[in-house]
Amino acid sequence: MPKQTPTIKDVAAYAGVSVTTVTNVLHGRGHRFSEETRQKVLRAVEALGYRPNQVARSLVRRRSYTLGVVVEHFRGALLGNPYFSTLLDGVLAEAVQAGYQLKIIALTSSDIEHVRQRTEDGSIDGAILAAPLHQSPLLQWAQECPLPCVVAGSSPPDLRATCVDVDDENAVYQGVKWLIAQGHRRIAFIAGPVNYWSAHQREQGYLRALSEAGIFITSHWIRRGNYSTESGRWAMEKLLQVRPPFSAVVCCNDWMALGALEALRRRGICVPEEISVMGFDDVEAAAVASPPLTTIRQPVREIGMRAAKLLIQQIESGTRTPERVIFPGELVQRDSTTAFAPETADTSKHPAAVRRVRRRRTY
């Protein structure tokens, strides 16, 4: 005799809660139950192998139970991009828990009519705009979209839409302040692409920290990359030609920092004894770099999860009051940075050569 398919009533009985509570948990209505109750329901779902009838739910509620994730200027390597793959992982985790699936809407341009055709055809219940470009027409679309919409990452502060992001400006500001406290005064910066708001904010954090410390800011210490390892190598080669030499460099993302490390290694420049290097993101490769990379961690997966949760709440409640959720960055100290001792400076090896007091690792 075939095993009977478990129902929502079976889940409720197993967890010792009402059917309504099970429904609220599966739909992500977190304000209506405790975390303990949520875990009981999820354990019951797993133990019984319960799967909601997606087709029946869609017919009854006239929903697709699908979240759209919109990515503009797609170049064919979405899952190979650590930022987007991690963001999607967070979105997917929250969506599946609430009984939703994902539809990736990869655009080769920022044409609003194109995105409307792909999102307003009834195939999705709401959209997450993933790290849009600065001044992208899609930002205007996010504010006017007839569907619930959340912007995840690289969101301008004046956007009239629900946004989930990291405090890019303050994160880099705190990182540069930490380097200054370690004795560094000549700090270079490898900036990101001008078409991302997040890159602009990180550069502003760098400039603010130097300005507040009374450090003269020279444009010669700033080179711009495109977030790739190769652009980080190129930028570092250019920076090594600058006079006066710098003692530390902050990079707008980890991949450019890894490229900078490679350029220094090719020149025979020791990190951190001669130049300290700091990145941003804390990708997996940062921890296994040589030396392990000091960086600023942003909670990309958590950003994706919160964006999906807020979007589902908008879909389920029918309300769309814009809100802005900002996560702090976190400095992760590894071996690519150390304290600077100006009295022991030695430029005999190359323009950027200096000696430093070695510090004990702290985490």
Walk through the language-model features, giving the residues of each.
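Bacterial carbohydrate/catabolite-sensing allosteric modules
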Residues: 1-3, 14, 47, 88-100, ...
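N-terminal helix-turn-helix DNA-binding module of bacterial transcription factors
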Residues: 1-65, 359-363
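Short beta->alpha connector loops
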Residues: 107-111, 130-135, 255
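Amphipathic helical "hinge" segments at domain boundaries
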Residues: 39, 48-116
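Non-catalytic positions within long, well-ordered alpha-helices that form the structural scaffold/packing
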Residues: 60, 119-120, 143, 180
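Short acidic/histidine-rich motifs immediately flanking catalytic phosphotransfer sites
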Residues: 120-126, 243-247
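Short beta-strand segments enriched in small/hydrophobic residues
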Residues: 21-23, 61-77, 178, 186-193
